[in-house]
């Protein structure tokens, strides 16, 4: 059984703790080692009167049981005084439970100004005042847990409680924003809607129901949400009588009710009402970004359905003939010089690491095969979008605050030099009318002398400039391609650093959106977002690693569509499908499941002979029989072995010096699994050994450690895990 949850040394402030729920919270926290501030004004359930006896009785009860507590008798509107009591007595504040409340129930028409105001002051303003007083202290100590107390009345409404309902749902809105602002400082805020008997509810509930809904049936949820090991943040929970349920927002898929070059009408709303209100296949947005985001994907959908922006009498920003003069316009040529240092800086910015030995060629100029990552070719060309660039094109007026990077194509004609100077020539290839904006398609060619090294195509969306009657598609635009519908052939993951955007911007993209919290907030994001081209670089590196063994000479081209933003610190998961020399892929944020790069692919230069990344079926290899036997043996004892080993081993079996087959022994997930092919996720240890030497190890003729030190067995990753190989091969590989 797991150890009990303790709060030793934590300082907990509970408001309205003189009775009911607050008393139950205070006693429960104190029983588990917390230092408790028991706040209660001492008035009745209507907020009339005051006194010290209620808080004093709870403090005395805690002390009798061996706990530590102090009383506070101030109104929650004096939040600073409550927090000062905690600081003066115990020196810190870790947990705030906003529980204090009163009732002034009246039918709506009978609510007086006083009835309305006092409810807002105690419930909403009081919680604000107390939490604000504690906030900076929690930020400085990089820790805090906050509970807001809402109500079923606030969530669903209740007759006679308009004032109470408004305040209670307001607390949920307050909590939702505190979640966003407190996340970086490890401050969690959750909201509960309790059903419990108290001096407030005893006037509206039958006596036997009040008795059944004991506060002690709510307190355990509050304690769990306030414990340092609880990762829940931003949740809304109904709780009572020993039952707990979590709530979330749900939104219909809705309907688009406007058509190309036609006004939007109330009749169109009426005619689509059933679809607008249909919760089949509903979405469940978890943030304002999810609610309003995904604009590029939406615009592509609008484009494919032939739907345009709604004109309301405003003149379009330009006409087709005006933009026609822009198409074909050549921007001034420019040079991009770079050294090995810039190549290394870029590689680090897109996640290359010395933790992966095969990445050394990208981060160490002294490596025998030092190479520049292929996607650095975008860095070479991006100056065409900055430093004047598009802003100086005659006839093209752009508000760069409304520019979104929609798609990117890069093609290499030979590997990028490890250093040098490339001359770049840019041209406006086309302009498309997407109704609610325009898409500018720009081609950039980069030369070393007269030799073409790489070609970029930038597709940027400018919000609010469309509707001029121009064409919606272009044969010049490199097409994005949907990924296959089958499960991916390979998946790689990398967790980005909190400093990822700060590091990547050193490669030349200095947009403050990616570093300045204030600028990001103005743009509608809770914090600075990662560069889309940084995610692009991570994804391309995953494909190169998985299917080309980091051989940059095999990289031919890449096309991506940017779908959603990524926040530094999130985990990027690249899902890949191999079809010939084309690797389809999409990239997700592992924590949310959001697709951030979609309809993407990498084209590889074909190779002759056996491919190191696409192993044969392993025919005529003795090792295939052994792996099959290990798989059969693990079916009965897999879970026990997983507990002992807790690792994923990827095997590269060679024949005549070439990789002839790959196998994975997954002893980390579920009941274990053995399958042919690379690890579905990331392997903890990758082992390369010949088919003959593998059989020698299995038969006990060759010790794995001796094989490693003699060079006959090569391991990368966590090589200490290879010590467990003897147990695996000895016990489960007997033929």
From Swiss-Prot:
GO terms for cellular component: peroxisome. It is found in: Peroxisome. Residues 623-735 form the SCP2 domain. Pathway: Lipid metabolism; fatty acid beta-oxidation. The modification N6-succinyllysine is found at residues 46, 57, 68, 84, 275, 355, 423, 578, 662, 724. One of its GO terms (molecular function) is 3-hydroxyacyl-CoA dehydratase activity. (3R)-3-hydroxydecanoyl-CoA binds at residues 405-406, 434, 509-514, 532, 562. Keywords: Acetylation, Fatty acid metabolism, Isomerase, Lipid metabolism, Lyase, NAD, Oxidoreductase, Peroxisome, Phosphoprotein. It comes from the Eukaryota. A motif (Microbody targeting signal) lies at residues 733-735. The modification Phosphoserine is found at residues 52, 304, 308. Pfam families: adh_short, MaoC_dehydratas, MFE-2_hydrat-2_N, SCP2. Substrate binds at residues 151, 705, 723. Residues 321-621 are annotated as: Enoyl-CoA hydratase 2. Its EC number is 1.1.1.n12, 4.2.1.107, 4.2.1.119. It catalyses: a (3R)-3-hydroxyacyl-CoA + NAD(+) = a 3-oxoacyl-CoA + NADH + H(+); (24R,25R)-3alpha,7alpha,12alpha,24-tetrahydroxy-5beta-cholestan-26-oyl-CoA = (24E)-3alpha,7alpha,12alpha-trihydroxy-5beta-cholest-24-en-26-oyl-CoA + H2O; a (3R)-3-hydroxyacyl-CoA = a (2E)-enoyl-CoA + H2O; (2E)-octenoyl-CoA + H2O = (3R)-hydroxyoctanoyl-CoA. NAD(+) binds at residues 16-40, 75-76, 99, 164-168, 196-199. The modification Phosphothreonine is found at residue 265. GO terms for biological process: androgen metabolic process; cholesterol metabolic process; estrogen metabolic process; fatty acid beta-oxidation; medium-chain fatty-acyl-CoA metabolic process; response to steroid hormone; response to xenobiotic stimulus; Sertoli cell development. The protein is found both as a full-length peptide and in a cleaved version. Belongs to the short-chain dehydrogenases/reductases (SDR) family. Homodimer. Bifunctional enzyme acting on the peroxisomal fatty acid beta-oxidation pathway. Catalyzes two of the four reactions in fatty acid degradation: hydration of 2-enoyl-CoA (trans-2-enoyl-CoA) to produce (3R)-3-hydroxyacyl-CoA, and dehydrogenation of (3R)-3-hydroxyacyl-CoA to produce 3-ketoacyl-CoA (3-oxoacyl-CoA), which is further metabolized by SCPx. Can use straight-chain and branched-chain fatty acids, as well as bile acid intermediates as substrates. This is Peroxisomal multifunctional enzyme type 2. It comes from Rattus norvegicus.
């Amino acid at each position: 059984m797991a150890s009990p949850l303790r709060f030793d040394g934590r300082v907990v402030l509970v408001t309205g703790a003189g009775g009911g729920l607050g008393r139950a919270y205070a006693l429960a926290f104190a029983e588990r080692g917390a230092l408790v501030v028991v706040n209660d004004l001492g008035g009745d359930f209507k907020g009339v009167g005051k006194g010290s006896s209620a808080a004093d009785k709870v403090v005395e009860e805690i002390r009798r049981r061996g706990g530590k507590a102090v009383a506070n008798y101030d109104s929650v509107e004096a939040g600073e005084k409550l927090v000062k009591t905690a600081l003066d007595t115990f020196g810190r504040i870790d947990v705030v439970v906003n529980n204090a409340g009163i009732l002034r129930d009246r039918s709506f028409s009978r609510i007086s100004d006083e009835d309305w105001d006092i409810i807002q002051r105690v419930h909403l303003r009081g919680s604000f005042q107390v939490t604000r007083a504690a906030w900076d202290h929690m930020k400085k100590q990089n820790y805090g847990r906050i509970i807001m107390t809402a109500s079923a009345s606030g969530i669903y409404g209740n007759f006679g409680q308009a004032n109470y309902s408004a305040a209670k749902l307001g607390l949920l809105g307050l909590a939702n924003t505190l979640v966003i602002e407190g996340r970086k400082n490890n401050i969690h805020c959750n909201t509960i809607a309790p059903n419990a008997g108290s001096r407030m509810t005893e006037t509206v509930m039958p006596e036997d129901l009040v008795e059944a809904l004991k506060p002690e049936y709510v307190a355990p949820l509050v304690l769990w949400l306030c414990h340092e090991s609880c990762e829940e943040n931003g949740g809304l929970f109904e709780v009572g009588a020993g039952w707990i349920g979590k709530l979330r927002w749900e939104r219909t898929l809705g309907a688009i009710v406007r058509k190309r070059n036609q006004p939007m009408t109330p009749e169109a709303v009426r005619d689509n009402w059933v679809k607008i209100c249909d919760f089949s296949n509903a979405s469940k947005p978890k943030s304002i970004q999810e609610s309003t985001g995904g604009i590029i994907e939406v615009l592509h959908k609008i484009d494919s359905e032939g739907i345009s922006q709604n004109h309301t009498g405003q003149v379009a920003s330009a006409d087709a003939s005006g933009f026609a003069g822009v198409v074909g316009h050549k921007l001034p040529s420019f040079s991009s010089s770079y050294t090995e240092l810039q190549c290394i800086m870029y590689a680090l910015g897109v996640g290359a690491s010395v933790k992966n030995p095969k990445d050394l060629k990208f981060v160490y100029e002294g490596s025998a095969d030092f190479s520049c990552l292929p996607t650095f070719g975008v860095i070479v060309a991006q100056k065409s979008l900055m430093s004047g660039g598009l802003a100086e094109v005659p006839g093209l007026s752009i508000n760069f605050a409304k520019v979104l990077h929609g798609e990117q194509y890069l093609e290499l004609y030979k590997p990028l030099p490890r250093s040098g100077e490339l001359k770049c020539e840019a041209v406006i290839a086309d302009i498309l009318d997407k109704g609610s904006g325009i898409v500018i398609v720009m081609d950039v060619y980069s030369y070393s002398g007269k030799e073409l090294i790489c070609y970029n195509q930038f597709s940027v969306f400018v919000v609010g400039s469309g509707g001029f009657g121009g064409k919606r598609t272009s044969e010049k635009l490199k097409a994005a391609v949907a990924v296959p519908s089958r499960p991916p052939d390979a998946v790689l993951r990398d967790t980005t650093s909190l400093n990822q955007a700060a590091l990547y911007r050193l490669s030349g993209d200095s947009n403050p959106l990616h570093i300045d919290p204030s600028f990001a907030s103005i743009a509608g994001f809770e914090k600075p977002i990662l560069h889309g081209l940084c995610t692009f670089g991570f994804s391309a590196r995953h494909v190169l690693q998985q299917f080309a063994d980091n051989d940059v000479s095999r990289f031919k081209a890449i096309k991506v569509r940017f779908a959603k933003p990524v926040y530094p610190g999130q985990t990027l998961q690249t899902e890949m499908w191999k079809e010939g020399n084309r690797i389809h892929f999409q990239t997700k944020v592992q924590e949310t499941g959001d697709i951030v790069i979609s309809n993407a692919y990498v084209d590889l230069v074909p190779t002759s002979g056996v491919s190191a990344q696409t192993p044969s079926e392993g025919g005529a290899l003795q090792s295939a029989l052994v792996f099959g036997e290990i798989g059969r043996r693990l079916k009965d004892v897999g879970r026990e072995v997983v507990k002992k080993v807790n690792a994923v081993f990827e095997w590269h079996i060679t024949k005549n010096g070439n990789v002839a087959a790959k196998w994975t022994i997954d002893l980390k997930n579920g009941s274990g699994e053995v399958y042919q092919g690379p690890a579905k996720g990331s392997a903890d240890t990758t082992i390369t050994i010949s088919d003959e030497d593998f059989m020698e190890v299995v038969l006990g003729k060759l010790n794995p450690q001796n094989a490693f030190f003699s060079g006959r067995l090569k391991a990368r990753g966590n090589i200490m895990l290879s010590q467990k190989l003897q147990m695996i091969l000895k016990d489960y590989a007997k033929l």
